Amino acid sequence: MKTLIACCGIDCEKCDARIATDTGDEALRTATARKWTAMNGIEIKPEYLHCMGCRTDGVKTYYCTDMCQIRACAAGRGYATCGECVEVMTCPTVEPILKHQPDAIDNLLSFGSKRLLLRPWHESDAEILYYYAMDEEVGPRAGWAPHQSVDESRDVINNVFHNATTWAIVLRETDKVVGAIGYGPSCDCDLPARPDEPTVGYWVGKEYWNQGICTEALALLIDRVVNHTGIKSLVSGHYVDNPASGRVMEKCGFVATGECCTSPSLYGDSNRVIRVLRWER
């Protein structure tokens, strides 16, 4: 994982202000100031952009400390980076950066372990999503219908998965998407959640079952919740005829609430019984 990432998601090693400082390229610094002026709607002079990397302990630019609206917005909300804000994908303040720096959102929202990378979904993932999601044994176990086409999978990526709390599960060794995990909007259903308590959901393609991937991904998600949010608890559940999913939750600290429910909003038989579990700090 990259370690020198600006508050807005820019990789500092690719930032023109940083490159101009490292190389002494005044023409590049001037051009960057002109571009950033247009993006921000305020005058940014070249001398404001003598940058040593805005996430290091070294000298920060005048632009970063006194002018950057993105940095001020994040700091005002108590965030180290925009990646801690659930509104990042729809935020008008950071939108110019995300538009001109396609990898910024991945830099902000990706995390993982030695084996797994959890990153935002890309539209280019549509074919691999369809490959897994057309399987009639995958979606129905998690309460969603098998996909009927690549176009449907693309639509799901753009309209269901396109948020700051839903991730593709990627095997680092092969750089291959193998499943999904998230909490909040993409997972909401009819579980008996507390106020402001997100619902967690996850799945992996059938060929990756029984390899500990969901357990590892869920543990990573919980670690992110603990370290980067104020969320106090999470709720989830599994169909009683899919106990393996419940074991994943229990391994990660979820405890059965003693409640069972049904969820008419999920795919399939609305009378299927769901066992409810909860994780708490």
Ranges and model annotations:
Residues A74-G76, N159, T174:
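Short, charge-rich binding segments
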